[in-house]
């Protein structure tokens, strides 16, 4: 039986404020190789036909992220409507009962960063993580095991949102009951926001051939860009 104890405060601000996090930052792809050309860093938040450029990477793997202030005007209104969602559905970890409280929010899930070349529109996926050991789980949560580490995703908000939530729930499996806890401390501004998901505890489900699941997660604005390790998964070896 599933029980939910939710203590939630969610405020929407019409006036602007300065959120934690940064709009411009740098990094380096740890597994960069000299045979890879310079590329754009994009988000496919509106599908593969509408990449949103948010930065560049040079031939040495040096990353420069510079989020635009607004979405490109080339994105059609009907496309925005298709991809728009509410905050709970844009978060990687979400409480099931906050939809009514978050009603009226309009956000777009940016997801992971991707690398784009003129000859290879989707050349690679770029994983921002604190430990590369978490990447297999990000690619396959059903059969790979998570580790205690952080990973990062982008969302775009159409309004400022201040969200402080402690969400607790118990999920019963055949042989085990797992107590889950998600702690949200998000101060999201209108525009692009980089979110950190920090896995702090993991529990086994007790079900054979099923991976463990994160049981304690904190969700905050990313504020320590130096802690991010960048790892690229390339899909091509040739770019000519």
Each PLM stretch: what is its role?
Residues 22-40:
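Structural motif
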Residues 25-29, 53-71:
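Glycine-centered loop-to-beta-strand initiation motif
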Residues 18-26, 236-240:
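Sec-dependent signal peptide cleavage junction
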Residues 52-55, 183-185:
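Beta-strand-rich interaction surfaces with strong enrichment in secreted/lumenal proteins
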Residues 43-52:
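Short amphipathic beta-strand segments in non-cytosolic proteins
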Residues 150-240:
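Extracytoplasmic cysteine-anchoring/structural motifs
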Residues 70-81, 85-169:
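Long, low-complexity intrinsically disordered regions in eukaryotic proteins
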Residues 1-23:
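Bacterial Sec-dependent N-terminal signal peptides
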């Amino acid at each position: 039986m599933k029980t939910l104890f939710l203590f939630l405060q969610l405020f929407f601000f019409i006036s602007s404020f300065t959120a934690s996090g940064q709009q411009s930052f740098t990094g380096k792809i740890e597994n960069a190789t000299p045979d890879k050309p310079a590329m754009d860093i994009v988000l496919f938040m509106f599908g593969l036909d509408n990449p949103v450029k948010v930065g560049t990477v040079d031939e040495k793997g040096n990353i420069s992220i510079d989020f635009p202030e607004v979405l490109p005007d080339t994105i059609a209104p009907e496309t925005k409507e298709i991809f728009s969602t509410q905050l709970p559905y844009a978060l990687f970890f979400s409480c099931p009962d906050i939809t009514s409280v978050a009603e009226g929010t309009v956000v777009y899930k940016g997801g992971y960063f991707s690398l784009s070349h003129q000859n290879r529109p989707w050349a690679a996926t770029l994983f921002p993580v604190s430990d590369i050991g978490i990447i297999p789980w990000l690619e396959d949560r059903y059969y790979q095991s998570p580790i205690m580490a952080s990973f990062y995703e982008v969302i775009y908000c159409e309004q400022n949102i201040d969200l402080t939530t402690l969400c607790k729930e118990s999920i019963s499996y055949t042989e085990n009951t797992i107590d889950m806890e998600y702690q949200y401390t998000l101060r999201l501004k209108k525009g692009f926001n980089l979110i950190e998901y920090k896995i702090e505890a993991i529990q086994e489900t007790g079900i054979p051939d099923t991976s463990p699941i994160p049981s304690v997660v904190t969700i905050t604005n990313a504020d320590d860009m130096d802690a991010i390790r960048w790892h690229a998964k390339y899909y091509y070896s040739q770019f000519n």
